[in-house]
Amino acid sequence: MTEPSQSSPTRKDLEQERVLEREHWMDGPPHELFKEMRGKCPVHWTSEITEVPAAAGFWSVTAADDVHTVSRDWETYSSELGGVVVIDEVFPIELARAMFIGMDPPKHDRLKALFQAGFTPKRIAAHEDEIREIVVSVLDRLEGRDNCDLVTEVAQPAVSRVIGSFMGIPEEDDAAWAELMNTALAANDSDYSPEGVENIEETIQRAMTQIFDRCSTMIAARRENPTDDLTSVLVNAEVEGQKLEEHEIVMGFFLLVAAGNDSTKATYSSGMRALLEDREQLAMVRDDPSLVPGTVEEALRMFPAFAHFRRTATKDTVLGGQEIKKGEKVVMWYASSNRDETRYEDPDRFDVHRNPEHQAFGAGGRHFCLGTALARLELKILFEETLARYPDISLAGRPTFVESGFLNQLKSLPVKLTA
């Protein structure tokens, strides 16, 4: 599969281009724009964000080598100073700093270390039968059906139950948690924003209030009766001899559940779309399951679940020939760096034999994704079981995208399950 070039408005001078304009994200990331930026101005300044006029401008980092540099230099590019999303105004900084993804060392390292033992490849592999059982049970619900939506009826319930089992969330609450996460992370999409996209702050505040209320109930229960789930780990964690505060526990919970819900769902759905649009590639993977691990890596490369994460410059510095001032936002665009022509031949083509290195989990450094082993195992099982159960699966309609410059994922993927 080679993705068609996206149509775009008449190109302004690249120096005046606003990367986060809604028009660029209606059908997924603006890959043609990113290609132009990598070629002409790989570290690019956007002066303003139309939908949030009060927001400060930001630097876009689009080339893989530059993303690698920013990701590994936390002393120059801080997660804690300004948070990890580009628009400060829609997510309170005190909440961002309560997640270890929004911290700098040493606190980041100490908090993340509490979970690393539970996310090693060996520990995650021990859950393979459990995860496969979850995926099979989700597919069983489609028995007798001719059509379904792979996003809402396969990906979402499967990943919600997997992360829910790790966190101690009752299965009957999976759908409610998934809806809250979708609203909190994709409030600029009208389908997730009942208050309207012009009221993003109110939408996020409403979702976060419900998240705090629900999570506080779980926290109280585990203080009363500790369990062996990750929520209990957060409740009983100590960093520098101090228990985590309530909002830190809630935001740690939020981070793990949000990542568990969105990352695998996004990459599986887009990976399946790529296979469905290239029947030759689909047939190769269906007929030779040994190609599934490479398919997983190629899907991660082409379709990273999160389009960007942000850092803030701690001092004046130079990157890609551009002078960056202390306090300015620096945005790493994984949706661009994973298609960098200097690293990948024909980067817009989905190739199950490529088995690439990529930056879908970050580009190394302190914030490399904690859940890589879990995501890879979930994706492997989802691809295996879907193609084994439905060898003749095909597209049944036009996929739709979440309208977001942060989440890189499909909102719907209608398919015909049988020939």
Predicted features, each with a name:
Residues 1-419:
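Cytochrome P450
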